[in-house]
Structure formats: structure tokens, C-alpha cells
């Protein structure tokens, strides 16, 4: 049976007022777990969050994190059982920047791997723009180590007339 997860950004305004109540409702909707969104973890310790989510039959699959919060998240997220630390997107405007971004993703992937997680990249529509003869997302995929970096394809951002999102 498939598992379904929800990104907490969908409920960010409600979560700040009633974290446990909102999460309990999310669990009752049939979700198996969450993707933490920029530190929305209800003020729980890592172990406390994992225990609370387990009590409502959910888990942390991933977390969107800002680059400047990487070190803090490398300490916090493993205790929650989180599997993926997700970069929310990069502003890439040249082939050189795309190659530099790929190396950055590999570097972050090595850090995530050192604590038992995998680093991921969340696309936006600009990642499907061509730089020369290749789309940015293709440059990133071709130049990152799949053992270190995963790609979280956001189908809404990938939906373009010239892109077959199913390929990704």
C-alpha cells in the first residue's frame, strides 16, 4: 500500500495556533506523515516530535530547510526519523551557476549522509528553462550523485507545455 505525506506549508497558519489539533486532523485525513516546512515542528524536541507523530500514526519523511539553517537541521532532524532534507530551490541563471549548484547539492548531500539522511532538491518552474541546449533540472540531475541527492519533483511547477513531467 502506498503512503501519502503532506507538506506542512499547507497548514502553516493553523499550526502556529494548534499544532497538535491540526496534526491530529491531518492524520485523520489519511496522511501517513509530514514534510516539515521551515521549522514548523510545534516546538517539540526531535524525540518529542517523533513520539507525538507516532501516537497519531504519522512520521516525518522530509523537511524543507534554508541553507543558512543546515547545521541546525543536521542536528535536529535525525532525531525525528526524517529521511530527506530538502533544499527549497535555487536561483540559477547560467550553465556555470547550474554546475556550481550541482556541486553545492553534492556537498550538502555528503553532510546529510553523515547523519543518516539524504539531501533533496525541490524544483520550481525556472528549473525547466533551457540554458543552451539543456534544461536546468537536467544539468542538476546529470551532475549530482544519486547516492547523495534526490529530486522532489513538484508537478505543479513542472507543468509546462514543453515538459513531460512524468519523465522526472
Question: Where do the PLM segments sit?
Answer:
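Conserved beta-strand positions
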Residues: 8, 36, 87, 121, ...
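Glycine/small-residue-rich loop that forms an oxyanion/phosphate-binding "nest" at active or ligand-binding sites
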Residues: 70-106
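N-terminal pre-domain/capping segments
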Residues: 1-83
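Acidic/histidine-rich catalytic cores of soluble enzymes
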Residues: 114-168
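Alpha-helix-loop-beta-strand connector modules within alpha/beta enzyme cores
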Residues: 47-65, 108-112, 137-147
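Charged helix-capping and loop-helix junction motifs
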Residues: 20-21, 47-51, 98-106, 133-138, ...
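Hydrophobic/aromatic residues located in beta-strands of well-ordered beta-sheets
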Residues: 4, 60, 85, 119, ...
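Short, small-residue-enriched loops and turns at beta-alpha junctions
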Residues: 12-14, 40-43, 67, 92-94, ...
Amino acid at each position: 500500500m502506498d503512503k501519502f505525506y503532506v507538506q506542512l506549508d499547507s497548514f502553516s497558519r493553523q499550526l502556529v495556533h494548534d499544532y497538535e489539533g491540526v496534526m491530529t486532523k491531518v492524520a485523520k485525513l489519511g496522511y501517513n506523515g509530514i514534510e516539515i516546512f521551515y521549522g514548523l515542528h510545534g516546538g517539540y524536541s526531535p524525540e518529542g516530535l517523533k513520539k507525538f507523530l507516532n501516537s497519531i500514526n504519522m512520521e516525518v519523511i522530509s523537511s524543507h530547510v534554508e541553507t543558512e539553517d543546515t547545521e541546525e537541521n543536521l542536528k535536529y532532524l535525525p532525531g525525528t526519523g526524517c529521511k530527506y532534507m530538502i533544499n527549497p530551490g535555487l536561483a540559477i541563471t547560467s550553465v556555470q551557476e547550474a554546475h556550481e549548484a550541482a556541486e553545492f547539492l553534492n556537498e550538502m548531500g555528503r553532510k546529510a549522509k553523515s547523519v543518516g539522511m539524504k539531501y533533496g532538491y525541490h524544483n520550481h518552474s525556472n528549473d525547466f528553462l533551457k540554458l543552451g541546449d539543456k534544461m536546468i533540472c537536467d544539468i542538476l540531475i546529470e551532475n549530482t550523485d544519486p547516492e547523495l541527492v534526490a529530486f522532489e519533483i513538484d508537478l505543479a511547477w513542472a507543468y509546462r507545455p514543453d515538459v513531460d513531467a512524468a519523465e522526472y
